[in-house]
């Protein structure tokens, strides 16, 4: 006999304050929206949003990825967002603007780009 409780919908927890982690590398942009404890609510990438190759690293691709993560996080009732930006990529600015345009109140923007104290040797300079 079937389990009588199988038709119950899973209730999504309501999170009002969230943290948007934006990892903007030179090749891609990853947007993850978490609660204050760091549990992921939603995420999106520029590559997963339909952009491939060099189009992944554009500001528009970062904007689309940010919008997709924002719509998924809105189902959890997210209203206020602290933004944590990491990396030197071209999608930094546009991803933050897209979160603001999605209806979230951006409370703070923090740059958490890791800066080496002369650690690993950087990649060689490009000769085009």
Curated annotation (Swiss-Prot):
The keyword DNA-binding does not apply. Pfam families: Ribosomal_S11. One of its GO terms (molecular function) is rRNA binding. Gene3D superfamilies: Ribosomal protein S11. The keyword Transmembrane does not apply. It comes from the Bacteria. GO terms for biological process: translation. One of its GO terms (cellular component) is ribosome. Keywords: Ribonucleoprotein, Ribosomal protein, RNA-binding, rRNA-binding. Coiled coil: none annotated. InterPro entries: Ribosomal_uS11, Ribosomal_uS11_bac-type, Ribosomal_uS11_CS, Ribosomal_uS11_sf. Transmembrane segments: none annotated. Belongs to the universal ribosomal protein uS11 family. NCBIfam families: PRK05309.1, uS11_bact. Located on the platform of the 30S subunit, it bridges several disparate RNA helices of the 16S rRNA. Forms part of the Shine-Dalgarno cleft in the 70S ribosome. Part of the 30S ribosomal subunit. Interacts with proteins S7 and S18. Binds to IF-3. This is Small ribosomal subunit protein uS11. It comes from Chromohalobacter salexigens (strain ATCC BAA-138 / DSM 3043 / CIP 106854 / NCIMB 13768 / 1H11).
